[in-house]
Amino acid sequence: MSVLRVGNASGFYGDRFSALREMLTGGPLDVLTGDYLAELTMLILGRDRLKNPDAGYARTFLRQLEECLGLAHERGVRIVTNAGGLNPAGLADAVRALADRLGIPVRVAHVEGDDLTAAHPGTLAAHAYLGGFGIAACLRAGADVVVTGRVTDAALVTGPAAAHFGWEPTEYDRLAGAVVAGHLLECGTQATGGNYAFFRDGDVRRPGFPLAELHADGTSVLTKHDGTGGFVDVGTVTAQLLYETGGARYAGPDVTARLDTVRLTQDGPDRVRVEGVRGEAPPPTLKVGLNRLGGFRNEVAFVLTGLDVEAKAALVRHQMEPALAKVSDVRWDLARTDRPDAATEETASALLRLVVRDADQEAVGRALSGAAIELALASYPGFHVLAPPGKGAPYGVFEAAHVPQETVDHVAVLHDGRRVPVPAARDTAVLRAVPEPPLPEPLPPGPVRRAPLGLVAGARSGDKGGDANVGVWARTDDAWRWLAHELTGDRFRELIPEARDLTVTRHPLPNLRALNFVVEGILGEGVAAQARFDPQAKALGEWLRARHLDIPEALL
């Protein structure tokens, strides 16, 4: 059967607006996907829906489509997107209205059944992560545009692949190959040099969006349109493969993909072949993302310049205590960004960050603002803040739950209005950790030099609820022989003191020369709670790469 060319034009709600047009005009495609839904996005859309029950979807997609629907129709490119968010039926209707207004004859279908909010009182949005077979049913029935709500990110690719190649639900290896391709595409330009540890290896000023050439056996080639920016090599693909994953088993509603079986090889300039992926029966449950409003938060950053930084911090904390007495959650963080004998005022300054959270907006609003501003002439020398605190703003909390697959009514609503139930997975297997794989022989002893880890290893980090993952990979076999034995869980805690009292699980992936670390609870209640300086752990991997270890000189 022919190769299926699937592109991506969005990695998040707010991604490059012109990407849809760029992908349609840049070269041949069969399907163009757009991923708009992050954990935080569901909360944002939930708040939109509170104001307007007809809202709840990614409105940017409609504006993009107004420019590009005719182009997609002319070129025969089908569009599959999760921009439906909390209201896929509403977005599907809006796309039909747009097509009618533009005079473009397109068939629009949508997928529903993910919304479980009614079964979870107190949540703003509760949505199950559906698989790709609802999308496949829509495409097999002739849809040109398929709109979904919450599906797994990879489902945007497994659905088109299953429809095109006629895969059955039990063809696990092929489905797993498509899951890996979907995971590589889902974050857009992160696969083509964006946010890449070794970004200086290519021109990443404006990376092109990725596409995958999928084959009937589940193998694929990750690439991009000719003439676009960025670059695709084994490193950029490895980085994205490790992003926001956990152990060797990468579970989804349709299949569990074994990341410890993935083989990546350079297949020419800007082409990486992905093969060897094994799949297993999916778990018996579906993940459900629960978003709720947690209360109100506020923050202020005091600037401490010059000498006596610790004493200045102690003074302002003492002065703020009366205003904070009734606040339920108070967090102080002192960032010693100051340097001795600094040449600029900025580099002579440290930042003392105060974050407060409470169910009562007033407790973290005017009371905090007034107390901080009243210190302007009555505190430490050089007193000032980065910005005056405002009124308390609402914050969200994300939690993950699981429900039996068969309790979720996954439905494909075809372009002609017919409703097709999508059965739950027939065979399932409880998710279990894989045994520790054999590691390579350590490097022989030799001279070492104190140097940053990032000189010999790349990293990419991200968030899953309150947890963070940090994927670390070596670029050479010898570097892997050293990394596999040096960067243990205990050494990770030493290098990242913030994780010292947290559960850190190390998952070796020798096929990728990589280690994946999962740090439980480091992000508190998730990104929307903004409890941490870097609430999505985006730079946690870069912090790790900047830490110094004794590295064999032969690797440097």
Task: Go through the PLM ranges and name each one.
Residues 1-3, 37-55, 73-75, 114-122:
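Gly-rich Lys/Arg/Thr-decorated short loops/hinges at beta-loop-alpha junctions or inter-strand turns
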Residues 115-148:
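An acidic, phosphate/nucleotide-engaging active-site surface
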Residues 28, 276-445, 450, 464, ...:
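C-terminal non-catalytic interaction/assembly regions of soluble proteins
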Residues 101-113, 158-198, 485:
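Catalytic or ion-translocation cores adjacent to nucleophile or general acid/base/metal-coordination motifs
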Residues 184, 188-317, 327-341, 499-515, ...:
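Active-site loops and adjacent core secondary-structure elements that bind or stabilize anionic groups
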Residues 27-45, 67:
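N-terminal glycine-rich anion-binding loops that anchor highly charged ligand groups
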Residues 1-22:
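N-terminal amphipathic/basic leader segments beginning at the initiator methionine
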Residues 82-86, 143-160, 459-478:
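Conserved phosphate/anionic-ligand binding catalytic regions in large, soluble enzymes, centered on
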